Amino acid sequence: VNSGVLAYSEDASTPAELTIQGGKVETSANGANGVFAYGSSTINLENATVTTTGEGGSGGIMVAGGGTLYAKDCNVTTEGGSSAAIRSDRGSGLMVVDGGTYIANGSKGTGPPAIYCVADITVSNATMQAGNAQALCFEGRNPAHIYNSYLEGNYTASDDDENCNVMVYQSMSGDAAEGTSYCTM
């Protein structure tokens, strides 16, 4: 698993827990996430700056495989294609974000959303922007809860696709459970 910071445990009887207060996390490799909670792990991230510049899924803060991540007052910026600022993937998880700025600046065509939702994600009191993509993308049966926040997307179709700022889809890769996604704002 390629990340600047990773908390990982496969065994619920020996969970991993990591707390980071302040500091900077920077990654530049393709596919390198900034801060990633996987499996039976929990990350508490507060007042930190996270920057990723690699292509191909270099998310800012991420959960997968059932991981849990709490982010408070962080500044997260991603520059690569398919690199959401708030990212989740196969196996779901829980992410709770309170305050801060989360910006995804990937290039047009592969631009990442501000939030890529394959987990239970709650965001409050935050600013989220996608420079060249939908603001929010749901894959499969997953909820997003957004309160007292600013969420902006900038997706414009390059072919016959519809212009939209929220995308909901079900991939056939098995990354996400089938069912209904929903968003509360």
Where are these regions (language model features)?
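Surface-exposed loop/turn motifs in large extracellular/passenger domains
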Residues: V1-S28, F36-G54, I61-S82, R87-K108, ...
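A well-structured
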Residues: N33
